[in-house]
Amino acid sequence: MTFAEEKTYKYIRYNHSKFCCVDVLEILPYLSCLTTSDQDRLRASYKQLGNQGTLWELFNTLQRRPGWVEVFIRALRICELPGLAEQVTRVYQSYLPPGASLHSLDPLQSPRIPTTVSEPSAFAAGHTIPDSGFQDKPGYPKPVQDTQPPKSPVENSEEPPQANFGAIPRMSGDSLISSPNPPALSPQPSREHPEQEPELGGPSTANVDSVPIATYGPVSPTVSFQPLPRIAPRTNLSPGVTVSALSAKTTLSSSSTGSAFAKGAGDQAKAATCVSTKEGVPTNSVTTSSVPSIKPVPVNTMSSKLPISTKSTAATPSTVPTNIAPSKLPINSVYTGIVPSKVTASVAKASASTMPPERNNKQAKETLEAPATVVTTGSSLTRPDISSRSLHSGPELSKPGVLVSQVDNEPFSACSMDLAISPSTSLGSEPNHGPEENEYSSFRIQVDKSPSVDLLGSPEPLATQQSPEEEEPCASSVSWAKWLGATSALLAAFLAVMLYRSRHLAQ
């Protein structure tokens, strides 16, 4: 705020009673130096405090804006308050530096009305906004829409390339305003876009300068939005494990009665193998997750009697198998890609034959109740279950149904050196008065009188609390006896004196 503006504000503050005739709601639209938030706040204050309470806040808000005096004088003249306008003009000119003069203070014909709803508008190329914030013409021309269909690339090639001599920034409400310093853009026809193909695996960039922008209004969506053609399909670079991801159809055949088909297309493939057994054992299903990968992995399954293996038709077979324990043993999930299983069909068959029939029946019942085993192959695998190795230990398999536990019958022996206790030298010959961490002080209590029978039945604190209560009646009885004796003595003396006087008067 300049010196002249400060003096003018002090004049308005000292002569505030002269400006009480100003209507806040009437003058607000003509104060272009105020922001939209200032006007909204003043209107809200007008509803709560009225015109007089809001007028003081109006002047406080005005004096924070540069050039507010000239705007205020112009607003006073528009609101038909020429007397106040002349007073403010005279005070303001008196404090201006020599040689400085006021700007044109003629009232505008059309005031600036704050717009609450933004409407789409398009200005002419040579149209500019005045510095004072007013608009000479309040009317807004309608945007020109291009309803013609887009021309073919052949027709575009026949036309000469159009060059944009001014950058037209996009404003809110789809309005176009020319920038004061337009940069020169390199003209290129739009037919060069189909020739530019995006690189595989890289970001596709479009040349912004090659798109001609119409100067007469916004372009229709059919012309402005034209997707570029894509030649090669998008490739997926995420690692993982999949079963025949590039093949269109893959057939998995098994040597037993069960068969399954798997079809893979694009980035995902799923394979499922269903195996049925002759003994009525539930079907073991193997599901391969649809995680994309480069190396195919075959899946091997074994039934209760005969091993059944399904081989993939991929070009490069893998040496890492996925095995499942036979149905005679407890079902455990075996994970692929960490440690290959060494249990073959012959070993599984031999272990199943050596087991007693009772255990076989129990295991058959357990496998009937157990859910289907699902083996999932993916990029991130966990460690195999260690509890499955403990099934092949010697003493546990030799004694089925019996838990063998080894108990050490030897007693525990230890010495005092094993105990972490700090040594204490309190019993030594030399006196040591320093504090010790684990040293405890002890004292001896000697009782000369043995406890009575009454004290054993009742706690000691109750006895100590009852003793004063018993002593109080004794003290009160002694005091009453003293008072009674003194009173009787006085009464006897009084009677003796009365008898003596009566005898003396009788004589």
From Swiss-Prot:
Residues at the site labelled Cleavage: 408-409
Protein encoded by which gene: Mavs
Pfam family, one: CARD_2
Parts of the chain on the Cytoplasmic side: 1-482
Region called Interaction with TRAF2, residue ranges: 143-147
Protein name: Mitochondrial antiviral-signaling protein
Residues on Mitochondrial intermembrane side: 501-507
GO biological process: activation of innate immune response; antiviral innate immune response; cellular response to exogenous dsRNA; cytoplasmic pattern recognition receptor signaling pathway; defense response to bacterium; innate immune response; intracellular signal transduction; negative regulation of type I interferon-mediated signaling pathway
Cross-link Glycyl lysine isopeptide (Lys-Gly) (interchain with G-Cter in ubiquitin) placement: 7, 10, 305
Annotated Polar residues bias: 300-325, 374-391
Ranges annotated as biased composition (Low complexity): 250-266, 281-293
Domain notes: Both CARD and transmembrane domains are essential for antiviral function. The CARD domain is responsible for interaction with RIGI and IFIH1/MDA5. The transmembrane domain and residues 288-424 are essential for its interaction with DHX58/LGP2.
Subcellular localization: Mitochondrion outer membrane; Mitochondrion; Peroxisome
Role summary: Adapter required for innate immune defense against viruses. Acts downstream of DHX33, RIGI and IFIH1/MDA5, which detect intracellular dsRNA produced during viral replication, to coordinate pathways leading to the activation of NF-kappa-B, IRF3 and IRF7, and to the subsequent induction of antiviral cytokines such as IFN-beta and RANTES (CCL5). Peroxisomal and mitochondrial MAVS act sequentially to create an antiviral cellular state.
Superkingdom per UniProt: Eukaryota
Residues recorded with modification Phosphoserine: 152, 157, 172, 178, 186, 220, 256, 387, 422
The CARD domain, residue ranges: 10-77
Region annotation Disordered: where it falls in the sequence: 123-238, 250-326, 350-401, 423-474
Transmembrane segment boundaries: 483-500
UniProt keyword list: Antiviral defense, Host-virus interaction, Immunity, Innate immunity, Isopeptide bond, Lipoprotein, Membrane, Methylation, Mitochondrion, Mitochondrion outer membrane, Palmitate, Peroxisome, Phosphoprotein, Transmembrane, Transmembrane helix, Ubl conjugation
